Amino acid sequence: MIIRSPESEVKIMVDRDPIKTSFEEWARPGHFSRTIAKGPNTTTWIWNLHADAHDFDSHTSDLEEISRKVFSAHFGQLSIIFLWLSGMYFHGARFSNYEAWLSDPTHIAPSAQVVWPIVGQEILNGDVGGGFRGIQITSGFFQIWRASGITSELQLYCTAIGALVFAALMLFAGWFHYHKAAPKLAWFQDVESMLNHHLAGLLGLGSLSWAGHQVHVSLPINQFLDAGVDPKEIPLPHEFILNRDLLAQLYPSFAEGSTPFFTLNWSKYAEFLTFRGGLDPVTGGLWLTDIAHHHLAIAIIFLIAGHMYRTNWGIGHGLKEILEAHKGPFTGEGHKGLYEILTTSWHAQLALNLAMLGSLTIVVAHHMYSMPPYPYLAIDYGTQLSLFTHHMWIGGFLIVGAAAHAAIFMVRDYDPTTRYNDLLDRVLRHRDAIISHLNWACIFLGFHSFGLYIHNDTMSALGRPQDMFSDTAIQLQPIFAQWIQNTHALAPGATAPGATTSTSLTWGGGDLVAVGGKVALLPIPLGTADFLVHHIHAFTIHVTVLILLKGVLFARSSRLIPDKANLGFRFPCDGPGRGGTCQVSAWDHVFLGLFWMYNAISVVIFHFSWKMQSDVWGSISNQGVVTHITGGNFAQSSITINGWLRDFLWAQASQVIQSYGSSLSAYGLFFLGAHFVWAFSLMFLFSGRGYWQELIESIVWAHNKLKVAPATQPRALSIVQGRAVGVTHYLLGGIATTWAFFLARIIAVG
């Protein structure tokens, strides 16, 4: 830590009125580009307009102006998010059965959408219990609302209006910080100040205020709800906040106020800041008192972290020094120069953030079912499946986005002349070794993981079950995973002496938790079937990484095209007379990476869906006998490819295929329509540009013949545009098909 004398004055960090507000540009499509602003000669114009409208790098090379545009656009994004949230809360207030669900969450399903009776589509309003007819929703909003202490639809209404106000505020902020008071480049590059504010403000005070809300509002209200008190009888949130006696009736230590805090007698607060572990047997969710404790602890950590970096007071860490000191005996110059990269290339910064946020999103997916945070979430199987699937897809897209922006950084922002022997340079110099080893790992994983399945299919086909890899023949037990499970199951009393239960029931050892005759969670057994599919996961993830990493490491140059950096981020081929150089741009690697990301995530969500239906989800009788949805068939059926096709895809598609004439029929239509969208993508992916240009020219001839030819000359999509349209429909069709398949199935049987 370096202590310096404080600077004399605080610098002015904004420019006043830098850009006049005017709507004239709005009437000039493509005003950001000299070429596009001329207007359309051919139909390619509209595609270029869409491709470049948000590519601020292509509008100007002034980093300050680019930064301001991005900053302003972020406020627009936040405005849309608030608008969306407002819509969710408004539907909860206006069209939902939230109050009915609150009074009986085990027998009533959440619904917040009622279809109007036009052309007979009111058939979609299924009976969700309690006499309410509507579409069952699986977003988890009801469970979050209950956990945060919302007891009436009026409160949802008020929150919806509040979110609209914030949406308007964000729109105003976006305009204000671009047109009225635009930050200077130095403000965007002041990373210490940014870290302090984000850590202490967003994460620290954000967590602290949430912890405060939970203690003063959520906990008491949920206490009453769990005890079966009618929501209308429960005091309103502000009464708990203003009247300490109300809280003291539930938590006696509240009567002492903040005295225990300042006298360090913190154990007095153990009534509402607990460390129990496991699930609340009433709601099947994490103990809300554990969650409040967690957010308080997180808040303190981040409030401390938000005071670590040196700003106006000359005390604390400087990021540049930290990075430049970061070198080992084998890493050359180490992280020298990384500070300059991350403060001048927003693509590099974004790539890191996307990689971390994507990984974090996938971690969230896995914790939502293993440690269900909200009341009654664990027994709402449709919501559990939806939340897992949603967070897996989002995480996958963010990670591909990380590779995309890393490659854009390499092409547009990386300056090889100023970098020598730092870590990035060293990685680039031995990229051949990295990629060829990774390629070998992919080949090994692919042949061996798939080979185990093929062996099982062959033995099964030949009637030799004793020679298959299975829990009842040749066992391949995941011993390391089982060891980790066991370690966690034994942790309470050993490595975590204060906890009464392990972090998650899935680890094993503990009993199951059932709510309203449905299993919330129980120890998840792992066996040969999981061992096999986990190696498919390893394979698909490694191939995705191979494609994306190759795209980044070879974005500027390769043996095939040494001057690739001059061709840009996306280009079809290295010009005429250079055969075999198509589809090598960094963009094409992102394109291919998306398909493998889709493969990887599909296998994960299929595994999750079947495993949970087979080994976790189900009903429990009065005698304590658990009946799983698919009766534990995962261990024996999923060890062959045939089993996946027959007992998962085909057997579980029966609900969506047979949904016509029922309230689930919309899923049947979506299943069909999304298959169609997916098939439509193949038309773009499997044919060449010349084919379409030829077709278009004969169609134009016909139009000329009839004297109805348009002024704008029709053109086939460029190669890159065609692939972009193709991959978009492939992913959209595939994801929507999976969504319809999953939801029709789980709403019918769950």
Curated annotation (Swiss-Prot):
Swiss-Prot/TrEMBL keywords: 4Fe-4S, Chlorophyll, Chloroplast, Chromophore, Electron transport, Iron, Iron-sulfur, Magnesium, Membrane, Metal-binding, Oxidoreductase, Photosynthesis, Photosystem I, Plastid, Thylakoid, Transmembrane, Transmembrane helix, Transport
EC number: 1.97.1.12
Entry-linked InterPro entries: PSI_PsaA, PSI_PsaA/B, PSI_PsaA/B_CS, PSI_PsaA/B_sf
Binding-site residues for phylloquinone, renumbered to this chain: W692
PROSITE patterns named in the record: PHOTOSYSTEM_I_PSAAB (PS00419)
Short name of any one Pfam family annotated for the protein: PsaA_PsaB
Topological type in the membrane: Multi-pass membrane protein
Residues that bind chlorophyll a': H675
Gene Ontology CC terms, in alphabetical order: chloroplast thylakoid membrane; photosystem I
Enzyme class: oxidoreductase
Location in or out of the cell: Plastid, Chloroplast thylakoid membrane
Binding site for chlorophyll a: M683, Y691
Transmembrane segments: 70-93, 156-179, 195-219, 291-309, 346-369, 385-411, 433-455, 531-549, 589-610, 664-686, 724-744
GO biological process, one term: photosynthesis
Binding residues for [4Fe-4S] cluster: C573, C582
Catalysed reaction equations from the record: reduced [plastocyanin] + hnu + oxidized [2Fe-2S]-[ferredoxin] = oxidized [plastocyanin] + reduced [2Fe-2S]-[ferredoxin]
Cofactor comment: P700 is a chlorophyll a/chlorophyll a' dimer, A0 is one or more chlorophyll a, A1 is one or both phylloquinones and FX is a shared 4Fe-4S iron-sulfur center.
Gene Ontology molecular functions: 4 iron, 4 sulfur cluster binding; chlorophyll binding; electron transfer activity; magnesium ion binding; oxidoreductase activity
Keyword Transmembrane helix part of the UniProt annotation: yes
Description of how the protein assembles with itself and partners: The PsaA/B heterodimer binds the P700 chlorophyll special pair and subsequent electron acceptors. PSI consists of a core antenna complex that captures photons, and an electron transfer chain that converts photonic excitation into a charge separation. The eukaryotic PSI reaction center is composed of at least 11 subunits.
HAMAP family linked: PSI_PsaA (MF_00458)
Family the entry assigns: Belongs to the PsaA/PsaB family.
Main function: PsaA and PsaB bind P700, the primary electron donor of photosystem I (PSI), as well as the electron acceptors A0, A1 and FX. PSI is a plastocyanin-ferredoxin oxidoreductase, converting photonic excitation into a charge separation, which transfers an electron from the donor P700 chlorophyll pair to the spectroscopically characterized acceptors A0, A1, FX, FA and FB in turn. Oxidized P700 is reduced on the lumenal side of the thylakoid membrane by plastocyanin.
The protein's name: Photosystem I P700 chlorophyll a apoprotein A1
Lineage of source species: Eukaryota, Viridiplantae, Streptophyta, Embryophyta, Tracheophyta
Gene expressing this chain: psaA
